[in-house]
């Protein structure tokens, strides 16, 4: 198991409405990268659960790539997912992560050629993130058979890392289905939507359950 902590960004291209909204709320509340790293540090002080940051390259460039990964590691972060930084084009990110002891987790999609899946597996560490659909987070999975075929094929190519699947996974049934070949499933938008509903309804008792 691991926890994924989002790094708010004003233009989260891969995200659906739930995470776009959460980013807007965080940014309008004044959340900075330093604040996000402090949240990670506070979490690490009370938990050994692996912690993964997910965000975008631009705020990290502004922060300073090397400084970011060093500070992430000292804050207890185990890995980083950057959907808009392909590992081949973002070699500086990859090297900075490696030097700091932070996993650089790359993504593949149903449209990713087999030879590139193999290359991404070689470059990545932690796990390879298999995007279930060509779209944004929180989208409907639709027909699952093409996704299962894609995951089965991807699993045969990914030899160096666990294969995790995400995007559009909402229910326990989704998790069971998607992990027939993947090593695990990532639930993001569904949880963010639940948190928003609880926050707007002030439903503390439901949150506790």
Each language-model region and where it sits:
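Catalytic beta/alpha-barrel core
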Residues: 28-31, 76-89, 103-112, 137-140
